Amino acid sequence: MKVLASVKRICRNCKIIKRKGVVRVICIEPRHKQRQG
């Protein structure tokens, strides 16, 4: 899980979702998981 100020899609499987007010990227590739912080 990367904590970044700016979350971006890395590949076409990445999905940007908002969960409890936190912007996250979920993907089938575990290394692409991100959270805005």
Curated annotation (Swiss-Prot):
InterPro entries: Ribosomal_bL36, Ribosomal_bL36_sp. Keywords: Ribonucleoprotein, Ribosomal protein. This is Large ribosomal subunit protein bL36. One of its GO terms (molecular function) is structural constituent of ribosome. One of its GO terms (cellular component) is ribonucleoprotein complex. It holds the Pfam family Ribosomal_L36. GO terms for biological process: translation. Belongs to the bacterial ribosomal protein bL36 family. The gene is rpmJ.
